[in-house]
């Protein structure tokens, strides 16, 4: 059985309906695959179940807190399993990656919300950033559905040998820079000093250089 875990801010994947019907539904009943939805809020320890905070260095929006997300991961995902964070600045998801993931017994998908997540969680939990395209969604659940759909149709016993190939191109643009939120020091890793300097010009230059480096590396 291929086990797919989605970490979300919902108790159920909002658009999972089609996965329970048709060929996928039959494959689900045959235990060829299974879907488990984990609510990240369940790992928040305060009474308000807070999962987000403001970014260091200023900026719009909120970020998912690394301590809460790390706890959710550690409680539900085994060490060594591949973990993907659905992000516009991630590596582009394609058919080649889908075919590669079919070989995995466990596929873990973090559905992003707000402006993103604290950069430190990516390295400490070996999370791979992945994107379904150069556009913005209101939440990562839709992107997770796209990945799940693409992977399921390749599983033996689901749709036989039928496969599709898709070749897309995107506009060249800079990807987002790393972001950080509280706590200041987490898992022995600190926020970059420039974001604490209060020098908006330096922060702007740092973010630009980071974006350029990430874009060169990933696009």
Where are these regions (language model features)?
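Structured adenosyl-cofactor binding patch, chiefly the S-adenosyl-L-methionine
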Residues: 121-163, 168
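Gly/Ser/Thr-rich beta-alpha loop segments that engage phosphate groups in nucleotides
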Residues: 60-63, 92, 114, 118, ...
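S-adenosyl-L-methionine/SAH cofactor-binding core of RNA-modifying enzymes
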Residues: 63-113, 118-119
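Hydrophobic/aromatic beta-strand patches that form the interior of the parallel beta-sheet core
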Residues: 36-38, 84, 107-109, 128-130
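N-terminal nucleotide/polyanion-binding subdomain common to many enzyme families
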Residues: 14-74, 196, 200-217
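Short, small-residue-biased leader/transition segments that mark boundaries at the very start
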Residues: 1-13
